């Protein structure tokens, strides 16, 4: 943010996937103490309804005049009502706090599993890298067979983005399924 200020550049942050409590703060950039000029958001903003939005500082917003920008999912009354309800729910229930607390708990449990090389997470955005003997796709398929939906994003990496209302008990169940899957792959 200082670099942008020093060089008279705008700082734009994309919070489409990471915004609205996912990373343990209302917006992910808030974890870093930076001040963007424009923030884009979608996905969690609508609670399942199609909507996208941007927020801008007052100074930057002056540049937006009627017809100077467009949107695919902006402004629909039903989606806007859903977004307002969703934002109230996220903030009133402190789902950012839950994401941080449960995300830290989940990561600590995952780090203890066999063959885990590294767990990377921020809130409830969680990646697990396994050693070279365990394939991410194999873990994904084994977990799916055990009714846990995850994704593989590399040869040895899985990613999980649980709901913001997930509990520690539900994370324990997920860890048990992943551990069972890993053990089945060792054979």
Predicted regions and their residues:
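Conserved N-terminal phosphate-binding loop of PLP-dependent enzymes in the Aspartate aminotransferase
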Residues: 1-187
């Amino acid at each position: 943010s200082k670099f942008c200020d020093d060089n008279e550049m705008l700082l734009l942050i994309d919070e489409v996937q990471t915004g609205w409590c996912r990373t343990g703060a209302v917006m992910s950039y808030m974890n870093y103490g930076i001040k963007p000029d424009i923030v884009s958001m979608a996905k969690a903003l609508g609670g399942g309804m199609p909507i996208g939005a941007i927020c801008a500082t007052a100074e930057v917003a002056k540049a937006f005049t009627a017809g100077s920008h467009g949107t695919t999912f902006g402004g629909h009354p039903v989606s806007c009502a859903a977004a307002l309800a969703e934002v109230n729910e996220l903030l009133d229930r402190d789902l950012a706090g839950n994401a941080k607390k449960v995300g830290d708990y989940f990561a600590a449990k995952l780090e203890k599993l066999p063959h885990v090389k590294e767990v990377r997470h921020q809130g409830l955005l969680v990646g697990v890298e396994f050693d070279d003997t365990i394939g991410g796709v194999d873990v994904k398929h084994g977990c799916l067979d055990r009714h846990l939906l995850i994704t593989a994003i590399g040869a040895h990496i899985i990613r999980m983005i649980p709901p913001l209302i997930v509990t520690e008990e539900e994370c324990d169940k997920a860890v048990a399924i992943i551990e069972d899957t890993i053990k089945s792959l060792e054979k």
